[in-house]
Amino acid sequence: MKDRIVRATAANGGIRLVAVLTTESSLEAKKRHGLSYITTCILGRAFSASLLLASSMKIMHGRVTLRVRSDGPLKGLLVDAGRDGKVRGYVGNPDLELDLVKINNNKYSFDFTKALGTGYLNVIRDSGIGEPFTSTVELVNGNIAEDLASYLYHSEQTPSAVFIGEKIQNKNVICSGGLLAQVLPKKDTDPLLVSLLEERCKEINSFSEDLFHSQDNLLSLIRNIFPDIDDKSISEKARSQEVGFKCKCSKQRSLNAMKMLDKCELEDILKKDGRAELVCEFCKNKYLINYEEIRLMIES
């Protein structure tokens, strides 16, 4: 099943519901960055969170940047996601390994709190019009879902519920994704809607299991919470959209970055190596800038 985002509304348009699957994106990041099991899960969660946030932007070129700065051994992370469904990102310590912790009923989980430590979640929304909007909140516990819910509560004052998780079998991530349920701004003072959202979300006992069983049909995942969604509130074209790991780096962007160096630095590169190799932090693609290209920069 390809990664996908699905949108719906409930309560006569008063509640917005978005579900996203990020399994393939997480595995692509694992391959490109050489991620461990825990860092694959953490980056997958950040992919889900950023795509859920970007899904509400009104223009297709709008983007959301999600950055975690913290004192944990993960050494932070950075994710860039667009309303167009493209997402990319990296973590500070891709090789991180931590022991599993027991949660309940002999079930074990990764210690996301220990991995991220204490710190801040920074969210930048860029609509491409005017200055980007930036907001920062303290990390709640590092599991990404509650950290995102805290951001929505403090920065957007929007009653929201966020569920993000993954399913792991035989040390492989077999599904990753998330779900966002929000009372829309014009309805957020309606106590009945807020209560309805709270009651429905209390019925979710294991989001990761629900995601695993509904990954081929995200609309059924949404219906697990709100069986009575507004079927005709969103057009079929707008309801479902493919998402995936996609980087916007290129050879030209690498050349432009090199041009920012002064001529002395460029001369030094030619003397020492005769060429330059630039590596994209987001996707690990490598771009070779040869002698002639660097010489042209110096002479121009």
Swiss-Prot record:
Main localisation: cytoplasm
Pfam families: HSP33
PTM: Under oxidizing conditions two disulfide bonds are formed involving the reactive cysteines. Under reducing conditions zinc is bound to the reactive cysteines and the protein is inactive.
GO molecular function terms noted in the UniProt entry: protein folding chaperone; unfolded protein binding
Subcellular location: Cytoplasm
Disulfide bonds: C247-C249, C280-C283
Keyword Zinc: yes
InterPro entries: Heat_shock_Hsp33, Heat_shock_Hsp33_C, Heat_shock_Hsp33_N
Known function: Redox regulated molecular chaperone. Protects both thermally unfolding and oxidatively damaged proteins from irreversible aggregation. Plays an important role in the bacterial defense system toward oxidative stress.
NCBIfam families: PRK00114.1
Name of this chain's protein: 33 kDa chaperonin
Upper lineage: Bacteria, Bacillati, Cyanobacteriota, Cyanophyceae, Synechococcales
Gene for this chain: hslO
